[in-house]
Amino acid sequence: MSSGEEIKLNTSEATPCSSCGGPMSYKPSTQALVCEYCGSVKEIEQGELELKEHDFVSFMESYEKESFNTTKVVECSSCHATATVDENLKSMACPYCANPLVEQDIHEERYIKPEYVAPFAVDRNQVVGILHQWIKGLWFAPNKIKRGIFSADNLRGVYVPFWTYDMQTYTQYRGERGDAYYVTVGSGDNKRRERRVSWSRVNGTVSNFYDDVLVTGSKTLKMDLLNSISTGWDPKAVQKIKPDYLSGFITEKYQVDLKEGYDRARDIVAQYERESVKRDIGGDEQRVHNMDTELSNMTFKHILLPLYVSSFAYGSKQYTFYVNGVTGRITGERPYSAWKIAFACFIGLVILIFLIFLFKDA
């Protein structure tokens, strides 16, 4: 294989069909393995699941000292997304920009393997229908988009890496509580009620436990789009990882490592903790002058969550779609038709002028 040749991945790890020997892949609509040739179905065995949390501090100490397992990953030369290369795919393209991945981009990295996965529950055909309905419902979209510029060939199922963090907080704070009251000012026609706030100094403590603070391990995803469809991903509604669930899909390798993910989770918790302090202060308004937070019992898990990714080109720009692989919820970027917007403005102006003359004559 030349260094510039598109990757052809070995399919020997695919589960062989007991009927014809062909490769079997996971089909979300059946929640089972289905043979690509004869259609035979093999149920995926699911044992009792006990979610295991890892102590963050002790794990980081051992991770920095010991030599952890490495895995082969491939990095896209265009958008720099990374994916593991042990998927049961015949060829591979970047799930985010569709750039072909080549052999020279494969390298080995230390890798904390994910332990749990939320399997795809929405299949490819359902997603194609969801995409077409979404596109048809777009206001002021160019006609070319409405007629179906989207190609199902660009639809890719990706398991996205996530970290979940648990932590206990204990926060001492100083601030002020504001209690509103009203006074009457002025006289005669100028008499009115004005709102005033009486401030008093307060201090206290709050303690909270935060469970499964979710942090994406991807730096390639567009976070504004991802956040809008993340509802429906339950970090506890997962299964122990099995190759069967990953068969036929791309598994992205995390770019946000465990420590960076923890820092992001801590920032998220700090926002929650500030709101907790405000609730504890009470009153109508609050001022928080100082917060001193201690963290304890920090644990984590590494999980995979399902996402469909697609895009289409219009003009000189690429537009991206994301579909939640569990709920089917969709979000995406879209173009606007300048002439449709201009025509709508013109019609609105005509109606406005007509109404002005109508009421003027009346």
Annotate the PLM regions.
Residues S12-A14, A32, N69-V73, S91:
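Residues immediately within or flanking Cys/His clusters that coordinate Zn2+
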Residues C17-C20, C35-C38, C76-C79, C94-C97:
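Short cysteine-rich clusters marking metal-coordination/redox-active sites
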Residues G21-P23, V41, A81-T82, P100:
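Cys/His-rich metal-chelating microdomains
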Residues M24-K27, I44-E45, V85-D86, E103-Q104:
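Short, non-ligating residues that shape and space the ligands of small metal-coordination modules
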Residues F68, I112-A313:
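Charged, low-complexity helical/coil segments in non-catalytic cytosolic or luminal regions
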Residues L305-T331:
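Extended, hydrophilic extramembrane loops/domains of integral membrane proteins
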Residues I353-A362:
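Juxtamembrane boundary at the C-terminal end of a transmembrane helix
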